[in-house]
Swiss-Prot record:
Family annotation (PANTHER family): ACTIVATOR OF BASAL TRANSCRIPTION 1
Protein name according to UniProt: Pre-rRNA-processing protein ESF2
CDD domains xref list: RRM_ABT1_like (cd12263)
Organism listed in the record: Candida glabrata (strain ATCC 2001 / BCRC 20586 / JCM 3761 / NBRC 0622 / NRRL Y-65 / CBS 138)
Superkingdom: Eukaryota
GO MF terms held by the record: ATPase activator activity; RNA binding
Record keywords, A-Z: Nucleus, Ribosome biogenesis, RNA-binding, rRNA processing
Similarity section: Belongs to the ESF2/ABP1 family.
């Protein structure tokens, strides 16, 4: 039994070996044919590769031309951008300003604005410094400071005073009404404060909150004052023009009258030119002379002759 079993196993192993050899032979045969097929395929693939390489080279040339055109376009765009840089900077600045204005306008719509009145401005304080001081209480939208009169400025500088600009009064608009009220309550009658060595530390401000007063009312008032001032100026100019015209007319009329008088005096002198000469009495022997004259002359001659003889 044991031997049979061994025989069976040996037969099976042998048969398996034979099958493996046959399979290997078949594979070798197939590999041989597959090489030929691969040669054919390789030949075809080489031809196709040569054909396929041509469009790739054409694509490369086209891509190079497109790259050159793109580089030229980029250079022209850079040149145009270099020319248009200042314009773009101005546009950018303007757009920032517009955005700030729009933001403040939106905040105004959300909140009710408040206006404070500054009856006294510290000497030589500029609007930027005033805005900085008031901004501690809230965001400020608009600020207006009225300059001193030109006559006062000239008088002050003529007397040896400081030539810097001074402001007399001002108005400030807060975006929030409560900030304006807080500013008026805090700063009115108090020192400005801040750093102890600052120029405006000990200056006192007079700040008053204007209830129910808007910036439009201030602009209307200023426009009204400007209109009144302009009307007065135009009236004064028209009056001065009338006076000048009247004066010129009077001067011309006086010159004309003087010329007329001179001409008349000259004509009168020419007409009244009568000359008087001292003449001796003349005796005549004319026929139409009276006989007394004729006899008188004869008697005078006789008298002369008698005196001589």
């Amino acid at each position: 039994m044991v031997s049979n079993k061994h025989d069976d196993f040996s037969e099976d192993d042998f048969s398996d070996q034979e099958d493996g050899i046959l399979l290997q032979k078949k594979k070798v045969v197939r590999d041989a044919f597959s090489k030929e097929d691969s040669d054919v395929e390789e030949g075809i693939s080489d031809e196709e590769a040569d054909v396929a390489e041509q469009p790739h080279s054409e694509d490369k040339e086209e891509s190079a031309e497109a790259q050159l055109e793109q580089n030229k376009a980029e250079q022209t765009n850079e040149q145009q951008a270099g020319v248009a840089e200042p314009v773009s900077e101005e546009k950018r600045k303007q757009s920032k300003i517009d955005k700030i204005i729009q933001r403040k306008a939106g905040q105004k719509l959300k909140h009710k604005t408040g206006v404070v009145y500054l009856s006294r401005i510290p000497p030589y304080m500029k609007p930027a410094k005033m805005r900085q001081i008031l901004s501690r209480f809230g965001e400020i939208d608009r600020l207006f400071l009225k300059r001193e009169d030109e006559a006062k400025h000239k008088q002050r500088t003529r007397g040896g005073g400081n030539k810097k600009i001074m402001y007399e009064e001002g108005w400030a608009e807060f975006i929030r009404k409560r900030d304006a009220k807080l500013c008026a309550e805090t700063l009115n009658g108090n020192i400005i404060g801040g750093k102890k060595g600052s120029f405006y530390h000990d200056d006192i401000l007079n700040v008053k909150y204007l209830p129910g007063f808007k910036w439009a009312d201030l602009t209307e008032q200023i426009a009204r004052e400007n209109d009144v001032r302009q009307a007065k100026l135009e009236l004064e100019i028209s009056q001065s023009n009338k006076l000048n015209a009247e004066y010129i007319r009077n001067v011309e009329q006086s010159k004309m009258l003087q010329n007329m008088r001179k001409r008349k005096d000259h004509e009168d002198r020419d007409q009244d030119a009568r000359r008087q000469f001292k003449q001796h009495k003349v005796s005549t022997n004319r026929a139409d002379a009276p006989s007394s004259i004729k006899n008188k002359s004869e008697t005078s001659v006789k008298d002369v002759l008698s005196s001589l003889l």
